[in-house]
């Protein structure tokens, strides 16, 4: 279970501190999903980065299972990211020196959870079969996004963090990715926290949470 309690975050600017999150509380149960929505600058991506341990909170607490993330060292956070979560951010961060098939398996191997049968299923579901020997620079933005999604899912993470997971995909591929995520949520204990601007994506996948000016403004069931 993921618990975000009373989280504040601000950044220094030439005009003074900019408050991005102001006392946000969220709870995400095992096997459930939550969609963060709201206008640009409302704090959605910031919250996702804080939950991933990629930035430090100013005040509050973030717990994921037995871990208190805001009290972990950088080394502990790095190990946690490698072994327990999957990340799909708008910067795909594929490894340029590895072909698609090795990019897909990279995190699963680090986590000690590489499963050839599961990887083959991901390759088929994401339509990556013809791309396995290509390198990231040879892929379109949508193709890179599909590889990033497959890499994040390959280790069957307990928590999947996704920032606009279907943002660069055509509608048919987007629907296939959404169905893959729904199947994963249904058949495994994976939890999903995602940022999306798409009401259609949020309605299919998740309970909706709206942030406004760094505060929780609204929440509703899908």
Q: What are the residue ranges of the model-derived segments?
A:
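ABC family nucleotide-binding domain
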Residues: 2-213
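Conserved switch/coupling elements of ABC/ABC-like ATPase nucleotide-binding domains
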Residues: 213-222
């Amino acid at each position: 279970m993921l618990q975000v309690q009373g989280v504040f975050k601000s950044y220094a600017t030439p005009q003074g501190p900019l408050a991005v999150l102001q006392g946000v509380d969220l709870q995400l149960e095992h096997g459930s999903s939550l969609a963060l929505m709201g206008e640009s600058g409302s704090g959605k991506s910031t919250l996702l980065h804080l939950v991933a341990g990629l930035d430090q909170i100013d005040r509050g607490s973030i717990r994921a299972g037995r871990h208190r993330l805001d009290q972990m060292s950088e080394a502990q956070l790095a190990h946690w990211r490698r072994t327990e979560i999957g990340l799909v951010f708008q910067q795909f961060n594929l490894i340029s020196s590895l072909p698609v098939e090795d990019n897909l398996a990279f995190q699963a191997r680090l986590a000690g959870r590489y499963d050839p049968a599961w990887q083959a299923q991901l390759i088929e579901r994401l339509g990556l079969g013809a791309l396995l020997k290509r390198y990231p620079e040879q892929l379109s933005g949508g193709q890179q996004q599909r590889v990033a999604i497959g890499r994040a899912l390959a280790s069957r993470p307990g928590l999947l963090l996704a920032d606009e997971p279907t943002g660069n995909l055509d509608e048919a591929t987007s629907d296939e990715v959404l169905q893959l995520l729904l199947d994963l949520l249904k058949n495994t204990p994976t939890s999903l926290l995602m940022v999306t601007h798409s009401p259609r994506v949020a309605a299919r996948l998740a309970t909706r949470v709206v942030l406004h000016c760094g505060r929780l403004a609204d929440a509703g069931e899908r």
